[in-house]
């Protein structure tokens, strides 16, 4: 366990530097709270859990700061950062003088509308972005009438969403252990499952990549050049491109656990691919086909192709592999060029599945080596992001175990999870949210309002997906 008597420096990898220095990875956990509960006591236990977690994962309590080298940063954890004071107490109940206009009862009845939970008052992030020292974690306990909204987000520079899932599993375990009634139970649990090994925090395997890698040796740049000769599918949008963010919609849908399995089996049967097609392949293919059909005209005689951007995890494909609980960045956005209107959902699923063969140790080492050779990658971060050029982005959180986390005491399992940050661009996105304890998955679909209306009327979509009206 780390000492709190000296400053600790966490060196960052080229992949860490490639990620945006923003709090794009963020969730709001939502619980009902009895009116008899002492909210100061709940905050105290959350803080104790965070304090213990920072002792085990020191970079979590630190700040991303410049190193003095152009475009280079590190994480600096000061002695005072180990006390859990990153967690902000925010009383938004009636009579607090700072009340939030929505009670827990009302937001639950309205099915926890996504737009409510991106309110600036629920998060300290906006204020943090003006600082030179950016805290790794943004944590705020918002007590509303009858409930708690716990905001937790992290700088993408520090870790990816898989690492964040691992960190929050440890945090929830530590919060649970802080309640007096939970102490004995926690001792009897298999705490080995939550022990932070040194290898989980070791970023050295990702510090150096392949040597002498030029820009056009990297798959994304080669793909960008090849695709520059294709017609842009956005020339065939059914409706004109949106000119205001108000023309976009955050639509919410749900797919049941049973439908997920049936979807995979149905698509697999089209091509006798039962043995290898995954549920995530099938779901991504369905989303690609249906969202494109809702947005892009199918009347053109030309073959239209465009990029689906998905995130793949490098932990298991690296040689040697990283620990599954590695707590840095190893996941990368990965563009896959597909037919905009494939002949079948199976055809799209097959192409998505086969694309993973290109996401391998060499691919990741080439990117690391290329970035490492640049020195200052500030401009390259922008150039690299442009290579993704997505027609659709899928950020799949389905397999994250957020709903399985028991926070103990007055909290227990969260009642709901909602994304903490609003979308602020016009890039269509689908976010399969963490599976609930019954296996059902909410899908957040960010597209033009006109396209969302057509998506709700799509027969193929409606065969598997149910709209959730907030």
Curated annotation (Swiss-Prot):
Molecular function as annotated in GO: acyltransferase activity, transferring groups other than amino-acyl groups
Pathway assigned to this chain's UniProt record: Polyketide biosynthesis
Keyword flag Transferase: yes
EC number(s) reported in the record: 2.3.1.-
Pfam families: TRI-like_N
Induction: Expression of the botcinic acid clusters genes BOA1-13 and BOA17 is coregulated by BCG1 during both in vitro and in planta growth.
Keywords: Acyltransferase, Transferase, Virulence
Stretches of the chain forming a coiled coil according to its record: none
Active site: 156 (proton acceptor)
Enzyme class: transferase
Stated family: Belongs to the plant acyltransferase family.
Function in brief: Acyltransferase; part of the gene cluster B that mediates the biosynthesis of botcinic acid and its botcinin derivatives, acetate-derived polyketides that contribute to virulence when combined with the sesquiterpene botrydial. Botcinic acid and its derivatives have been shown to induce chlorosis and necrosis during host plant infection, but also have antifungal activities. Two polyketide synthases, BOA6 and BOA9, are involved in the biosynthesis of botcinins.
Protein's name according to its UniProt entry: Acyltransferase BOA11
Species per Swiss-Prot/TrEMBL record: Botryotinia fuckeliana (strain B05.10) (Noble rot fungus)
Origin organism lineage: Eukaryota, Fungi, Dikarya, Ascomycota, Pezizomycotina
């Amino acid at each position: 366990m780390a000492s709190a008597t000296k400053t600790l420096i966490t060196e960052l990898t080229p992949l860490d530097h490639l990620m945006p220095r923003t709090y794009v990875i963020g969730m709001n956990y939502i619980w009902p709270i009895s009116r008899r509960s002492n909210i100061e006591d709940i905050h105290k236990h959350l803080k104790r859990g965070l304090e213990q977690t920072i002792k085990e994962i020191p970079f979590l309590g630190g700040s991303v700061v410049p190193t003095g080298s152009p475009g280079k940063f590190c994480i600096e954890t000061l002695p005072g950062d180990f006390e859990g004071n990153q967690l902000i107490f925010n009383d938004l109940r009636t009579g607090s003088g700072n009340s939030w206009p929505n009670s827990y009862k009302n937001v639950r009845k309205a099915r926890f509308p996504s737009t409510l939970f991106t309110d600036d008052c629920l998060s300290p992030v906006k204020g943090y972005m003006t600082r030179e020292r950016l805290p790794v974690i943004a944590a705020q306990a918002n007590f509303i009438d009858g409930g708690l909204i716990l905001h937790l987000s992290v700088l993408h520079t520090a870790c990816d969403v898989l690492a964040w899932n691992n960190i929050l599993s440890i945090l929830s375990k530590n919060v649970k252990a802080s309640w007096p009634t939970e102490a004995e139970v926690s001792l009897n649990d298999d705490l080995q499952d939550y022990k932070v090994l040194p290898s989980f925090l070791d970023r050295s395997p990702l510090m150096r990549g392949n040597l002498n890698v030029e820009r056009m040796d990297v798959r994304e740049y080669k793909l960008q050049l090849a695709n520059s000769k294709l017609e842009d599918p956005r020339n065939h949008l059914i409706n004109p491109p949106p000119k205001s963010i108000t023309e976009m919609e955050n639509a919410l849908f749900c797919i049941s656990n049973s439908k997920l399995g049936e979807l995979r089996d149905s698509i697999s049967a089209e091509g006798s691919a039962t043995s290898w097609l995954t549920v995530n392949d099938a779901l991504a293919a369905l989303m690609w086909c249906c969202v494109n059909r809702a947005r892009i005209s199918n009347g053109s005689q030309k073959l239209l192709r465009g990029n689906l951007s998905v995130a793949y995890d490098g932990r298991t494909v690296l040689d040697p592999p990283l620990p599954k609980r590695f707590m840095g960045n190893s996941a990368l956005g990965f563009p896959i060029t597909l037919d905009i209107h494939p002949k079948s959902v199976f055809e799209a699923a097959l192409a998505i599945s086969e694309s993973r063969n290109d996401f391998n140790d060499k691919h990741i080492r080439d990117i690391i080596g290329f970035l490492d050779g640049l020195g200052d990658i500030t401009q390259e971060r922008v150039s690299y992001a442009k290579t993704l050029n997505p027609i659709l982005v899928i950020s799949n959180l389905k397999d994250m175990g957020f709903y399985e986390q028991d926070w103990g005491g007055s909290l227990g399992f969260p009642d709901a999870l909602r994304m903490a940050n609003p979308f602020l661009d016009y890039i269509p996105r689908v976010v399969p949210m963490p599976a609930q304890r019954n296996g059902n998955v909410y899908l957040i679909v960010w597209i033009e309002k006109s396209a969302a209306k057509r998506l709700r009327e799509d027969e193929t979509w409606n065969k598997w997906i149910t709209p959730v009206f907030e």
